[in-house]
From Swiss-Prot:
Residues 280-358 form the PUA domain. InterPro entries: AceGlu_kinase-like_sf, Asp/Glu/Uridylate_kinase, G5K_ProB, Glu/AcGlu_kinase, Glu_5kinase, Glu_5kinase/COase_Synthase, Glutamate_5-kinase_CS, PUA. One of its GO terms (molecular function) is glutamate 5-kinase activity. This is Glutamate 5-kinase. It comes from Pseudomonas entomophila (strain L48). Belongs to the glutamate 5-kinase family. Substrate binds at residues 54, 141, 153.
Amino acid sequence: MRSKVTGAQRWVVKIGSALLTADGKGLDRGAMAVWVEQMVALREAGVELVLVSSGAVAAGMSQLGWTSRPSAMNELQAAASIGQMRLVQAWESSFGEHGKHTAQILLTHDDLSDRKRYLNARSTLRTLVDLGVVPVINENDTVVTDEIRFGDNDTLAALVANLVEADLLVILTDRDGMFDADPRNNPEAQLIYEARADDPALDAVAGGTGGALGRGGMQTKLRAARLAARSGAHTIIIGGRIERVLDRLKAGERLGTLLSPERGMLAARKQWLAGHLQTRGTLVLDDGAVKALRESNKSLLPVGVKTVQGSFRRGEMVVCVGQDGHEIARGLANYSALEAQKIIGQPSDAIESLLGYSAEPELVHRDNLVLV
């Protein structure tokens, strides 16, 4: 299984705040230099590399003399705007010592939710990688709001892995990987070396929250691995304190937790759909519709929907769930929530008489639907 790591040609590497700062007292240039040495070695070994870097808020906090992470959005955004400049300058300086160039990419969820902007971002990233430049990606914290933020850089890294069709997502953290129990409380806890990303048993052991400087705990890392798996990427959750960890991963050493996708890579449009995190409503399906989606790759017809929840417009993302509340799929609605309310439970040939017009016979077409 570790051959999936050694043979991976396109890596997305996410480095958390705790691994880039000196106990919250500003950026640790020495630590960053060590990371750069390893990433340069990967590039010289033929690996295409994209870096998702946390640390902007932590760097800004240090510059402002703050000792604890603020909760107010405006204060977080102020810290991020100050720290982002220092963070990117530090990466550029360190990579420059090895003759490598970096490029700053700041993303918001809107950039990936809009199909045209998604394709533009993908084209830019691919061009940078082809030029041998290392893209340094972060969330654009200065403009996002709670409603449109990714939530953490683990999730952002997974979406970037989808965007660039990466073979491997490496999430570097302050833990050695995922354990079968909390190692802070249980000395008998064992590292989980390999598992399927969709294994439900992992949910029980992924408890806990992020550290003082970051937002992402182990649950968000597991969620990120599952998101990356939708585009066929493997994910390694691994301790960033392990000496020369990237070098050793490339050499095939059995470190960290390797989470593998169940299925192969989704088609490009399906990858974009899978990356949608902002959903606007929910469709509750009957058992027949659930079976049709899961087993026959069918479109979702109005007759198979029992309930419409939320408020959404035509073309917005909705979640499809069974009557037990379990998510089955997500897709783009052909009708608004108000229109859907009028046609659910009815055959498609009744749509025109119910609405006065018929846009599509499906509530969600299979080309705009992705199973989860």
